[in-house]
Regions:
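Catalytic core of non-heme Fe(II) oxygenases with the double-stranded beta-helix
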Residues: 105-148
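Non-heme Fe(II)/2-oxoglutarate
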Residues: 1-94, 114, 140
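Residues at beta-strand starts and edge strands
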Residues: 11-13, 100-102, 123-125
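A short coil-to-beta-strand element that immediately follows conserved catalytic motifs
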Residues: 93-104
């Protein structure tokens, strides 16, 4: 994929870019995620009967757990808004768009587990942001064809 340009995967627009860690509190956010992870490394079995190990540290399950600290993402939405606006402008330069974005998930995986393919229902599009990614340890996001 070509960074900062519209690319097409299965006929659907995709956009890859880098977010400068100096523009948001990357280390603080990552530290909060890692502290929660250390308290409970694999408490969510993401898929029931799966050939793959799917034990992950998954944000939506954190909300009701008093032991885990709420992660403060306040520095990210403004940066996401810039990226989303740029993406939409590249799709249709003549149009003015308004959008809202919500951080609905944070997943921490460090122990040879995977998040299985899934669909984000109710979303016009999704954004994946890797705060920390080691090519030797992690599998990248894989896009499956929506046609089969």
């Amino acid at each position: 994929m070509i960074p900062n340009e519209i690319n097409y995967i299965y006929g659907l627009p995709a956009y890859i870019t880098k977010l400068d860690p100096k523009l948001y509190e990357k280390n603080k956010i990552l530290s909060q995620i890692e502290k929660n992870y250390k308290l409970s490394k694999a408490r969510n079995k993401w898929a029931g009967d799966s050939f793959f190990k799917t034990e992950v540290h998954y944000l939506p399950e954190d909300k009701k757990n008093p032991k885990l600290k709420k992660i403060n993402y306040y520095s990210l939405p403004q940066q996401y808004e810039k990226i989303i606006t740029n993406f939409l402008h590249k799709l249709a330069p003549q149009k003015n768009f308004t959008s809202t974005n919500v951080i609905v998930n944070c997943t921490c995986i460090r122990h040879n587990s995977v998040m299985l393919p899934h669909i984000h229902t109710g979303c016009t599009f999704s954004l994946v942001h890797y705060l920390s990614f080691d090519k030797k340890q992690h599998l990248p996001t894989i896009f499956k064809s929506p046609y089969y």
